[in-house]
Amino acid sequence: MDEQAGPGVFFSNNHPGAGGAKGLGPLAEAAAAGDGAAAAGAARAQYSLPGILHFLQHEWARFEVERAQWEVERAELQAQIAFLQGERKGQENLKKDLVRRIKMLEYALKQERAKYHKLKYGTELNQGDMKPPSYDSDEGNETEVQPQQNSQLMWKQGRQLLRQYLQEVGYTDTILDVKSKRVRALLGFSSDVTDREDDKNQDSVINGTEAEVKETAMIGKSELTDSASVLDNFKFLESAAADVSDEDEDEDTDGRAKSVIDTSTIVRKKALPDTSEDRDTKEALKEFDFLVTSEEGDNESRSAGDGTDWEKEDQCLTPEAWNVDQGVISKLKEQYKKERKGKKGVKRPNRSKLQDMLANLRDVDELPSLQPSVGSPSRPSSSRLPEQELSRADEVEALTFPPSSGKSFIMGADEALESELGLGELAGLTVANEADSLAYDIANNKDALRKTWNPKFTLRSHFDGIRALAFHPIEPVLITASEDHTLKMWNLQKTAPAKKSTSLDVEPIYTFRAHKGPVLCVVMSSNGEQCYSGGTDGRIQSWSTTNPNVDPYDAYDPSVLRGPLLGHTDAVWGLAYSAAHQRLLSCSADGTLRLWNTTEVAPALSVFNDNQELGIPASVDLVSSDPSHMVASFSKGYTSIFNMETQQRVLTLESNVDSTSSSSCQINRVISHPTLPISITAHEDRHIKFYDNNTGKLIHSMVAHLEAVTSLAVDPNGLYLMSGSHDCSIRLWNLESKTCIQEFTAHRKKFEESIHDVAFHPSKCYIASAGADALAKVFV
């Protein structure tokens, strides 16, 4: 029997009680055999060869995916590390550069302090050891430059390793070259040395005069430039400041190459001039250039258009080809310097010699045709001139004029000879027109001696726009009126140094507080003991001015406020003080002009324009030529003169009033000339107009600014007019010629407004401006 038939078969043959099972027989045997085969088949199917292969392939694919993800993450992290390293290196370079700048500025500041102290006090300022700043980066660069005696193989290996590092970081050689050239261009360095050497190589190959000395010099130069290029790239990464040391190294190598070739020849010195040579030496060398041209004319022919080939050719020749005696050259140099010193002291010829010279120059046909001297390359412009002009120049040299290389000897400037030899108006000069030129010179001298105003003080204590200002008639004191409801008094002699500039700041010595709204105008009495202000509250406040030397922190003095002048029902726009009658004029938005007695706080003495037939007054002033008259401008564009004693309107000045447009004809300010019967008005349409007070006719009109003209002031002598505008500019005008002689920007815009008022000091050299930017500025 087969042993592998199963356990059922084995037990049925040997067990003594198996006879009861024999009745089932073949069915039981078949069932038992089927169960055993199924269990064995299931065990074998779990570890089949295809399943194992499939499992291995699946696991390998999963491993490859995870490995790819790991590689991507590794590459990203490496890129991030490289980026951060580059960023760190850039920050370090920036820090080094900033430290160098700080040290440089500190050193410059110490020098300026010492210079200022020496100029002011005449003694040296003791600041300790004033040594030029030493930079750590420079010391590091010097230590890096020292090991230059390495072999060529070491340089190549270092260069290759550096290129590999740069490629990993993300830089390439091209980017480095571009950045290096850009930095050099910004710093003002140039690579003239390499260009010069390339030109020398080309010329030497063309001329066929290559020398062994030149070859050895160029071999040494190539080795040095090979190493210098590596240092250039490395130092560019280290710091931007190392370019200076690289340039110094290039200059040193250039000096070594220059020392290999004989430096005793004139041509070599001409090709690579030494910076220590002075101007006289260079000009002396130019005088001997004819030696070079004559020598070349015997040996070979040169093209007429090329004037520099002779320099390049002779650089490769040996010094024995010239046989130049250096002693003779030095003697000629000294002689030339003495001649130049003698020519510097030559005086101009007198008038008779000039007239004779002019007469000779006008007779072109009678001049003899002299042969020009030997042409030298040092005078390229002389070859372009005709022979007649050269002959004239030679004649002029006999009149002790210095030679001018083909340019006009009378003009003495850079213009070339024009028609009539560039004489222009000098050719027609006669005795008759001397008076005209004298008057012209006098006018020019007046303009040259004219004072130029410069900003001196900035007054910064107000919190809102400054509407008006007034100077004390005698003292350097200024009062400003602001939209912050206050007036402030400033002593221009009590200054304090400003925080951020060299200018001086002034602090207010007193603040006037009584108005219940913005203060629009202010005026001072003739003796400076009282001042008056008007505001939007319709009140005119009368003040007693304090002592200019008062302590700003003194106790409050109630006697400063004298009391209000009541009568106006709307904002007071303008004030004017009459010193002759001690009267005060005011104009208000209620349409009236009022005359007040300043000696007492009382109602107005008289009221003008009560029916508002001319409109609402905007500005008022006293007529200086007639103290009993006043002039006022109105919103409808009219300007009228009133008699204060009779309260009658005397004259209405000529005006082109457009009834359809109110803004175009608006007059912002009217003032009277201090000595002449002239009224001047400032208009919203950018014009300034001048009127005759006797006839009312318009004398002159001009567009004075880019935007509306807001304020006017005339100096006490009546020579100059100052105007302010919303275009942020102040302009100073000559009243005689009606021309602008100075313009300066004083304030910034705020709500499309800029300058509200300008003023001259009555007795001192001050002018002031008030702006919408809450600043008042004083000019001297």
UniProtKB/Swiss-Prot annotation:
Keywords, ordered alphabetically: Calmodulin-binding, Cell projection, Coiled coil, Cytoplasm, Membrane, Phosphoprotein, Repeat, Synapse, WD repeat
Coiled coil: 53-120
Region described as Caveolin-binding: spans on this chain: 55-63
Region listing for Disordered, in residue ranges: 123-150, 289-312, 334-353, 364-392
Record-linked InterPro entries: G-protein_beta_WD-40_rep (IPR020472), Striatin_N (IPR013258), WD40/YVTN_repeat-like_dom_sf (IPR015943), WD40_repeat_CS (IPR019775), WD40_repeat_dom_sf (IPR036322), WD40_rpt (IPR001680), WD_repeat_striatin (IPR051488)
Residues where Phosphoserine is found: 137, 227, 229, 245, 259
GO cellular component, one term: FAR/SIN/STRIPAK complex
Main location (coarse class): cytoplasm
Residues bearing the modification Phosphothreonine: 225
Transmembrane segments: none
Subcellular locations according to the entry: Cytoplasm; Membrane; Cell projection, Dendritic spine
Basic residues compositional bias, start-end: 338-351
GO molecular function, one term: calmodulin binding
Lineage top rank: taxon: Eukaryota
Expression sites by tissue: Mainly expressed in brain but is also expressed at low levels in various tissues such as kidney, spleen, skeletal muscle and lung.
WD repeats: 461-500, 514-553, 567-606, 662-701, 704-743, 750-780
Family: Belongs to the WD repeat striatin family.
Protein's name according to its UniProt entry: Striatin
